[in-house]
């Protein structure tokens, strides 16, 4: 089973920046143990949500031709927690995109305020780790992750279609 720690993309600028959201719900079992009586989204899972947002951004920059693996959490600092009822916003920006790796600067927001900064380093596994015997199929970008990006793109197409329809009918009046 694969845990997905983002719910949707709200912005996606290829090779540059992605913004995703995570709605925190008390229905999530991990919140009942962290912490009993005061449930918060564990910072480790916030880092994973940012890594998923950024990993899709990095993978898309190369048309998902390579496996992108989180190589290092360079820095993660949090000023506050997300709690049930909150919506976290993950903003990931590519700082460097090279043949073997990519560097990401990430900011986490809650209710419009910054609550964390995260710097991540990703490796392109097909180039950097060919001797590890990784499976041929792209196990990093499974259908669940690609569905998040495709749903965002479908929403953009639908919005463009609606905007075009409004423009064409408003010219007749």
Residue spans for each PLM region:
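HotDog/MaoC-like acyl-thioester-processing domains
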Residues: 14-17, 83-84, 93-173
